């Protein structure tokens, strides 16, 4: 179903409340990555260009709800936002202070300091919606949470619409899940099958090839009868992995498993690594990355792909030397003619680490939200926007 778009509304002289996801990583009060602030800029600038006054809402971290906590204050975010916009940004400490005027920007302090935010309290939702004439939901990274500022306010506001960032995210995932150019290849990595079981089952229905990596691949290898040594895998989920492999055969989908792997005695820096065929992993070794023949196998499928969705690395890339497979995969995808969507915190972190983010088709800003979309779930705030359209 369609949603009302911010671009289509007359915002001249109006107060526009924009829910963004400015939940940036911080260390000692310093922002270590401002990607989410930069992603919000076009929406805020569009509202200003249309002659609106802007009030921005966001959460930061996980403070005790209803209590002010300086370490979770949005003050550093207000300063960085002001630098990037090239104009002052007022930090409002309370709902009563959250006022603005055409051409001006106010950032309300962390919405999680407000009692009732996470419980989706109707009274708080009405107050947040009532801060302006138009309520813009633009926080894809929080769209999977039914909170007062994400879902409740959207349902309560006089006028509610989707911002450009949220629209771009939904359109990217629509291209992957609902109207994809085929063949479609999904790469699902990460540590545990248990966190991605619904995702794997849903994707298998939609894609042509499902590639598994990381600890997830270890569980599938064990389910296929291979010895995986000391590798991280989930013994209790071997039947589930076997079911998924059987379903792939039934649906005539490809589910290629690694054919060779990089191993070490433990997951730690500067380990002595070894290359083994999957049938020859010693009992004292851990599988920590894919080998070159596996990479070649995966590239064979990716070379034919028109659409690729990547959720999770194929090795322990955060520790050298176990990132070679993930890096090589990222480099291959960066040169691909396919439409590539990278969604999920670790795979996004990987392409950023290797300086390849700008060469991917679309980088999602929301980890949990993108995971829920890939699982086939409806995002509460998007459902609310669709109901209002």
UniProtKB/Swiss-Prot annotation:
Organism of origin: Desulfovibrio desulfuricans (strain ATCC 27774 / DSM 6949 / MB)
GO biological process, one term: glycolytic process
Ligand binding (ATP): 196, 318, 344-347
Family annotation (InterPro entries): Phosphoglycerate_kinase, Phosphoglycerate_kinase_CS, Phosphoglycerate_kinase_N, Phosphoglycerate_kinase_sf
Cysteines paired by S-S bonds: none
Pfam family, one: PGK
Keyword terms: ATP-binding, Cytoplasm, Glycolysis, Kinase, Nucleotide-binding, Transferase
Catalytic activity: (2R)-3-phosphoglycerate + ATP = (2R)-3-phospho-glyceroyl phosphate + ADP
Family the entry assigns: Belongs to the phosphoglycerate kinase family.
Assembly, per entry: Monomer.
Cellular localisation: Cytoplasm
Positions that bind substrate: 21-23, 36, 59-62, 112, 145
Gene3D superfamilies listed in its UniProt record: Phosphoglycerate kinase, N-terminal domain (3.40.50.1260)
MF annotations from Gene Ontology: ADP binding; ATP binding; phosphoglycerate kinase activity
Organism placement in taxonomy: Bacteria, Pseudomonadati, Thermodesulfobacteriota, Desulfovibrionia, Desulfovibrionales
Protein name: Phosphoglycerate kinase
């Amino acid at each position: 179903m369609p949603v009302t778009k911010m671009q289509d509304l007359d915002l001249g002289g109006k107060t526009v409340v924009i829910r963004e996801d400015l939940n940036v990583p911080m260390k000692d009060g310093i922002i270590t990555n401002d990607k989410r602030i930069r992603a919000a800029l076009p929406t805020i600038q569009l509202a200003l260009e249309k002659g609106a006054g802007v009030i921005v809402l966001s959460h930061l971290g996980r403070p005790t709800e209803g209590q002010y906590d300086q370490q979770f204050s949005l003050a550093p975010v207000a300063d960085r936002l002001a630098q990037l916009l090239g104009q002052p940004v007022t930090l409002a400490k309370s709902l009563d202070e959250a006022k603005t005027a055409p051409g001006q920007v106010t950032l309300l302090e962390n919405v999680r300091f407000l009692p009732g935010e996470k419980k989706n309290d109707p009274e708080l939702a009405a107050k947040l919606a009532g801060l302006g004439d138009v309520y813009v939901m633009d926080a894809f990274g929080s769209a999977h949470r039914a909170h007062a500022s994400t879902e409740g306010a959207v349902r309560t506001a006089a006028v509610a619409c989707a911002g450009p960032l949220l629209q771009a995210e939904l359109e990217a995932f629509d291209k992957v899940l609902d109207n994809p150019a085929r063949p479609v290849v999904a790469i699902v990595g990460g540590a545990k099958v248990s966190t991605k079981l619904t995702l794997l089952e849903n994707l298998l229905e939609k894609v042509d090839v499902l590639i598994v990596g990381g600890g997830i691949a270890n569980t599938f290898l064990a389910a296929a009868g291979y010895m995986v040594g000391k590798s991280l895998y989930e013994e209790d989920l071997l039947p589930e992995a076997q079911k998924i492999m059987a379903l792939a055969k039934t649906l005539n989908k490809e589910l290629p498993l690694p054919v060779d792997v990089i191993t070490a005695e433990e997951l730690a820096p500067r380990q002595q690594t070894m290359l083994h065929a999957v049938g020859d992993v010693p009992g004292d070794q851990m599988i920590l990355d894919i080998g070159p023949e596996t990479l070649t196998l995966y590239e064979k499928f990716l070379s034919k792909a028109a659409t690729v969705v990547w959720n999770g690395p194929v090795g322990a890339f955060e520790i050298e030397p176990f990132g070679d497979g993930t890096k090589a995969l990222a480099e291959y995808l960066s040169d691909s003619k396919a439409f590539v969507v990278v969604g999920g915190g670790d795979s996004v972190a990987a392409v950023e680490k290797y300086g390849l983010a700008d060469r991917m088709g679309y980088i999602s800003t929301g980890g949990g939200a993108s995971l829920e979309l890939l699982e086939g779930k409806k995002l509460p705030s998007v459902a609310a926007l669709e109901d209002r359209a």
